[in-house]
Amino acid sequence: MKSIPIILLVLIGLLLASVYSHDILITEKGQKSLDKLDKAAATTLQHGENIQLSCDVCQIGASLLEDFIKKNASLTEIIKGLSDLCIASKEEQPEVCTGILNNYVPIIVDVLIQSDFTPSQLCGYFKICSATGSSESSSISNSFDNEYRQESFNKPTMKVNKKPQYKDLSNQEPLVKKFKGNDSIGYILQISDVHFDPDYKVGSNPNCGRPLCCRDGVGSAGPIGHYLCDIPFSTVELIFQHLATLTDQLDFIVWTGDNPPHNVWEQSQAQQELATATLAQVIQKTFPNTPVLPSLGNHEAYPADQYVLPNSQWLLDSIYTYWAPWLDADALELVKERGYYTSLIKPGLRVMSLNTLENDMINFYNLLPTYLKGPNNQSDWMINTLEQAQSNGEKVLIIGHIPCTVKSASTDGWCAMYEQVVGQFSDVIIGQLYGHTHYDQFSVFSDVATHTIPTGMNYIVPSLTTYQNHEPGYRIYQFDYSTNQIVNYYQYHANITEANETGALNFQLTYSAKELYNMDDLSPTSWTKVANQMKTNSTMFNSYFENLSSSPIKESCDQACQTKWICQIFGITSSEFDKCYGV
């Protein structure tokens, strides 16, 4: 999920105010704007991490930056100024302020200097200001959207303008030699967002005032876990002891990333690598003879969410090593070069694992003009792979981490491209399996021309971590290999409160998709019908809402809340969400 605590988003506004000079604070105009900024920031902060950063914070900061953009300051001065402001706000502890700023400010400043964006446009890019707030702020998302739509493809055939040479995929060896199910029916396990914390301490304080707790102090952190914290490694072991009982049923496993904990202010490259290495070892030990299809999460990066080549080559080198037991040489070669790959699951069925750090709004490197259009970019590879699959009579299952929903803090440029690809190859793509939000969601893709014809389905699975009030969960998809279609899925959860009391972690079936929504099949058309019924059928919507967070905290959802969540289903880009929501 979005990893950076709200203080960093507030500091984006503050950074815009001082990125070039701490001297702005001593001017009369700058001081007045700063006073307003402090007040707006405090108002934003007191509502907690799940509330969007106030547009005022960002706009005032942008105004200050634009007034003093010609002045220069060192990174040391910028970080010190921001640290002083952060610590003075008392909304984060000093070590969190300094840790986050030291990690992220050099990247943000470097990107601002290299990019062509004005500070006001950044407020729109980060979705801090809506389209109704500032035409300049909202223009940046539309600019990314339009550039992808107009320049990446030749309409209406969606061919890549300058297609590089890619490997012939027609002779790949399948990963699954023999399926375990009866007749044509098999089962796929998806796990995501484990976020285990090796420093979790039983009996520690879950309300420590930092972005991640249960690591020190005295409090109610239970032996199995706590809803405000990431799970201990001992709980990971319990989870996989349970999953091991499913081995005889599973044909393959989809592992959609986010392995390290949420201590984003004090992480290191070595810690990020160790988290992935540890989980890879656990998975391989638990399922020694079951194929595993991994994808890269935003938390695997260091700092979290930040990815650009060649700076991030260490990350690709590490997953190349840890994913090696499951992927063939061609797939691993592409992993080491780009962080994505394709493999043949069985004749006629292919997987594409995407590197969705390119779809991460909090990856500041995505502001650079080359991220969408560089040589051998991911969108070109994606289209080429789908074209080959289409020619070879194959169906494709897409897996990734960050989905295209407003909840996931995705980028409109990427999602505009992706939406077109899904529409163009709707006869090839049979489903999309993602994670990241920690919520149990789904989104329906439709044709970009009219948004009336369903074209694809994205299934977003809940997390295994309990962080931010979730019961740990995993999902099993029922798959018909004769038609290469997902025909049902089963969502499982464990109750952490009960587990802490009994010492046993028991997973129970929460629901079956077909039974819960009374569906004949899981086609995009059927899911569109379900989503539209939620607009008027409160019973159906309440079933969806209850399973969204799988939280012990039961919240009410009024009409505005209901509309928001339904628009998340249809809003692949922020402009589509806003249109649905009536913004």
UniProtKB/Swiss-Prot annotation:
Q: Which organism is it from?
A: Dictyostelium discoideum
| Cofactor note (record) | Binds 2 Zn(2+) per subunit.
Keyword Repeat included in the entry's annotation: no
Give Gene Ontology CC terms: extracellular region; membrane
Cite the entry's keywords alphabetically: Disulfide bond, Glycoprotein, Glycosidase, Hydrolase, Metal-binding, Secreted, Signal, Zinc
SMART domains, A to Z: SapB
Q: Known PANTHER family for this protein? A: SPHINGOMYELIN PHOSPHODIESTERASE (PTHR10340), SPHINGOMYELIN PHOSPHODIESTERASE A (PTHR10340:SF58)
For this chain, the family text in UniProt reads:
Belongs to the acid sphingomyelinase family.
Q: Where in the cell is it found?
A: Secreted
Q: Which residues are glycosylated?
A: 72, 182, 377, 495, 500, 537, 547
| Binding-site positions, Zn(2+) 1 | 193, 195, 258, 438
GO BP of this protein: ceramide biosynthetic process; sphingomyelin catabolic process
Q: Which domain of life is it from?
A: Eukaryota
Q: Which residues bind Zn(2+) 2?
A: 258, 298, 401, 436
What this protein is called in its record is: Sphingomyelin phosphodiesterase A
Which coenzyme or cofactor does it need? Zn(2+)
Disulphide bonds annotated for this chain are 55-129, 58-123, 86-97, 214-229, 567-580
| Biological role stated in the UniProt entry | Converts sphingomyelin to ceramide.
Q: Where is the Saposin B-type domain?
A: 51-133
Membrane-spanning segments: none
